Curated annotation (Swiss-Prot):
It comes from Prochlorococcus marinus subsp. pastoris (strain CCMP1986 / NIES-2087 / MED4). The lineage of its organism: Bacteria, Bacillati, Cyanobacteriota, Cyanophyceae, Synechococcales. PANTHER family: GLUTATHIONE SYNTHETASE, RIBOSOMAL PROTEIN S6 MODIFICATION PROTEIN. This is Glutathione synthetase. Keywords: ATP-binding, Glutathione biosynthesis, Ligase, Magnesium, Manganese, Metal-binding, Nucleotide-binding. GO terms for molecular function: ATP binding; glutathione synthase activity; metal ion binding. GO terms for cellular component: cytoplasm. The gene is gshB. It catalyses: gamma-L-glutamyl-L-cysteine + glycine + ATP = glutathione + ADP + phosphate + H(+).
C-alpha cells in the first residue's frame, strides 16, 4: 500500500510538532509506503497526473530512499497537507488531485471541498453556534458592528495560526484607519467577531476524523496576548469535551462526512464555534503528548477502514 503526502518543503516541517509528520510515521508503522512531494511536483500528462515524489523512511524522521515520477493513480491515498495560504498554486493543485480522485484514489481531504470550505467562512454555515459575526469589506459596516458589540476581533479570511488577527474596541484610536488597512481600502472582506473574554481560559482544538471526535487540547493564551494559537505561543493543556461541545461535534460530523472532509480541526471558545480547519489541521502531536495515546495511529486505522 502507498500513501502520498503533498506537503510544504520537508525542511520546513518540524517532526516534533507537525501533524503531517505524525501521520507519516503512523502510516509507516502500518507498513504503508510513504511518498512525499510538494504541490509544485504535480504535473498532468493528458488525463493522467503524475508526482515527482520521494519514497521516505520516516522513523524517527525522513530519510529519502528514491525519487520517481509516479502516476497518482498508483497511490491508495493522497494526503493534501500543504499549509495555507489557499492561493492560486494551492487551488490548482486541488484540481490536479481531483483528476486522481476521479480515477478512484482517495484524497484527504476531498479536493472540491478544500476549495469550497474557506476556514473562516465555512463556519458561517453554523452561525447559530458562533459568537456574533460579520464578514464585510465596507468600513462603515465594520465600525457599526464594533459599536454594537463594543469589543471585537478582526480576522483576515486567508490567514492561519492567528496571523494578522487583531482586537479592537469601539473606542480604539484610529479604528477607521486600521479597518481600511486590513481590508486593503475596502477591497477585501474580513471577518469581525464579538470578542469572547473567556478565551483567557482557553480555545479548544478538537480533531474530528471521519465524523468522530478523537482528541482535543485546550490552548491558553500567554504573555498578555489574546490569541491562543500554538504558533503564537499559546500553551497546550489537557482537556475533556463538555456536553455542549460534544453536541457541536455531532451536528457538524455528518456534514463533514457528506462533504468528504475526513480530517478536520474545529476551534471552540466558551462552547461557541470559532473556526473550521480543513486544509492542514494541526494538534496531533500536542494531543498525543498530553494524553499519552497515539491518536495518529487511530487516524490511519480509521482511514484504512474506508479505502
Amino acid at each position: 500500500m502507498k500513501f502520498l503526502f503533498v506537503v510544504d518543503p520537508i525542511k520546513n516541517i518540524n517532526p516534533l510538532k507537525d501533524s503531517s509528520a505524525a501521520l507519516m510515521q503512523a502510516s509507516s508503522k502500518k507498513k504503508i509506503e510513504v511518498w512525499i512531494c510538494t504541490p509544485q511536483d504535480l504535473e498532468a500528462r493528458g488525463d493522467e497526473v503524475w508526482a515527482s515524489s520521494w519514497r521516505a523512511e520516516v522513523c524517527p524522521w525522513v530519510s529519502f530512499k528514491e525519487n520517481k515520477c509516479i502516476p497518482l493513480a498508483e497511490f491508495n491515498c493522497i494526503w493534501m497537507r500543504k499549509d495555507p495560504p489557499v492561493n492560486e498554486g494551492y487551488l490548482y493543485a486541488t484540481h490536479l488531485l481531483e483528476v486522481a480522485e476521479r480515477k478512484g484514489v482517495k484524497v484527504i481531504n476531498k479536493p472540491s471541498s478544500l476549495r469550497a470550505w474557506n476556514e473562516k467562512l465555512g463556519a458561517l454555515r453554523y452561525s447559530h453556534l458562533m459568537a456574533p459575526t460579520i464578514v464585510a469589506s465596507k468600513v462603515k459596516d465594520l465600525i457599526n458592528f464594533a459599536q454594537i458589540n463594543h469589543d471585537v476581533v478582526v480576522k483576515p479570511l486567508g490567514g492561519k495560526g492567528g496571523q494578522g488577527v487583531i482586537r479592537l474596541t469601539k473606542d480604539s484610536p484610529g479604528i477607521k484607519a486600521m479597518i481600511e488597512l486590513i481590508t486593503s481600502q475596502e477591497q477585501l472582506p474580513v471577518m469581525m467577531q464579538k470578542f469572547i473574554p473567556e478565551v483567557k481560559e482557553g480555545d479548544k482544538r478538537i480533531i474530528i476524523v471521519n465524523g468522530e471526535p478523537i482528541g482535543s487540547i485546550n490552548r491558553i493564551p500567554q504573555g498578555g496576548d489574546f490569541r491562543s494559537n500554538l504558533a503564537m505561543g499559546g500553551k497546550a493543556e489537557k482537556t475533556n469535551l463538555t456536553a455542549k461541545e460534544k453536541k457541536i461535534c455531532t451536528e457538524l460530523s455528518q456534514h463533514f462526512k457528506d462533504e468528504g472532509l475526513f480530517f478536520v480541526g474545529i476551534d471552540v471558545i466558551n462552547e461557541m464555534l470559532s473556526e473550521i480547519n480543513v486544509t492542514s489541521p494541526t494538534g496531533l502531536r500536542e494531543i498525543e503528548t498530553l494524553s499519552n495515546k497515539s491518536v495518529s495511529d487511530k487516524v490511519i486505522e480509521k482511514l484504512l477502514e474506508i479505502i
